[in-house]
Amino acid sequence: MKIAHLPKSVALELTYRCNHKCKFCSCPWDAPTSAYPKGEELTVCDWKKVVEVLYDKGVESFSISGGEVLLKDGFESILRFIRQEGGKRGLDLPIVLISNARKMNEDYIRLFKELNVHLSMSLPGYDTFQEHTGVDNADGVLHWFQVAKRLGLKTTLNVTVTKKNYGELFQTMSLGLINGADDVLLNRFLPGGRGLAHMDELMLTPSQVNGMLDVAEEVLSYANKQGNVGTEVPLCAIKDVEKYKHIHIGYQCAAAKGFFVIDPAGNIRTCNHSPHIVGHAFRKPMIEDIDYWNTFANSEYSPAMCSECAMIKKCDCGCREVANILHGSPKRIDSSIII
């Protein structure tokens, strides 16, 4: 009998609601002509039951997002419960909270400090912020980085890099760090969700991906900070892997291995980018589509064109879920980066 083993980390998407309309958003329920089933959102009590079950199954660390997590009534109670239940088990790992910061306030930041929450806030460009999000709030995001710094809360600057904001990446990263961000997470734009309707205007060229890495290394070296690229890049797409000392690049997919995702209705997916539901938090077993889960859990997805590559054991050939979204199988090519 095939058994699905849950990773140690989970991302809880607490709500579908969002007060931005980001062109690059990869939430599967916002894809054009989406067939993704938006079920009724779990209540706060439901989420507490989910958290307890996950701890009992060996999950140790949590991140929470949406949609926009600050729009979920009672999200504070869920945070407290995660911390409380973790404490019973001797766990005090930071809870990562991902927000666009539009509804942020100082009381929330004080709460995050109290509960050992690591706050990640999105700044997809400065001059192009409104063009990307539909909202004019870049200065608002920078303000909350300042407040978090003053109150001693650790933060991450989250930048989705697109063709539209590529030219201002130096400025965007610099502003985030100057205003108090402790580190940086870069994500190259990936087709998925609402972003499928904006691929031509947002998708980076392979040359721009290398330029993104060069700019990130330059800014981080000046600031003496560290950063990460959160979306996989194939090794063969990078001109000089060895020169990057401050920006850390992911080459392998962590879906169903390092983490998994639970959507607002309790449905389980291998990653936040994926539209493929593999189970539900309240079902037994939780993972029902074992074959799809294990494709990711066991890294059984290398494209045929990469099978003879000497680097195949340390590179997943780009984002496997993009391959599935664009071409119908995680074993196909990630054409967002490999031409």
Q: What is the role of each PLM region?
A:
Residues 242-251:
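Short, basic/aromatic recognition patches
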Residues 43-50, 287-290, 326-339:
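Short microdomains enriched in Cys/His and/or Lys/Arg
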Residues 17, 21, 252, 305, ...:
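The −1 position to Zn-ligating cysteines in a subset of zinc-ribbon hairpins
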Residues 253-257:
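Short, small/polar residue-rich loop motifs at catalytic or cofactor-binding pockets
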